[in-house]
Amino acid sequence: VDLTPLPSSKLSRREREEYVLRFYAYLYNYQSFVKSVQKFLKESIELIENDFTGNEARLREILFSTFNFVNRNFKSGFKRNNTVSIVSRVRYEAISVGCALAIQQNPLIADKTNVNTNWAFEDEFLSMIRSDASNSKPKVIARIEYVRDKILEAT
């Protein structure tokens, strides 16, 4: 909850649950993303539900290990800085899924601390996630894999 602060108006619309859905949808299916986020999420729900049955512990561990890693290594969590009160969806998706992919590729990363994540506050990454960043398939893939590769390089 601390990593994804949301105003009460968004909480009442169940946006926290949507962030969890976005995490799993992009983690397992980001390369299939086309253009419409809502359509992508809707199509991903069925895939996630099928995978969730019998795998609850593993899926929960992926989420928790990713969030713990972000909490330890990103000075502002998913936020751009500590003065911002909410987390942008695009930033959240890129960082959460990119970190999870890196952890899946190298599970030893999950327990690392003091990983250099300064790149998350530099122009190259910020331009990938700015408010007018497109949700085109190449851009979604590029920002998720950028985070994954930066985490793998830094560990």
Regions found by a protein language model. Name each.
Residues 1-155:
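Flexible coil/loop and intrinsically disordered segments
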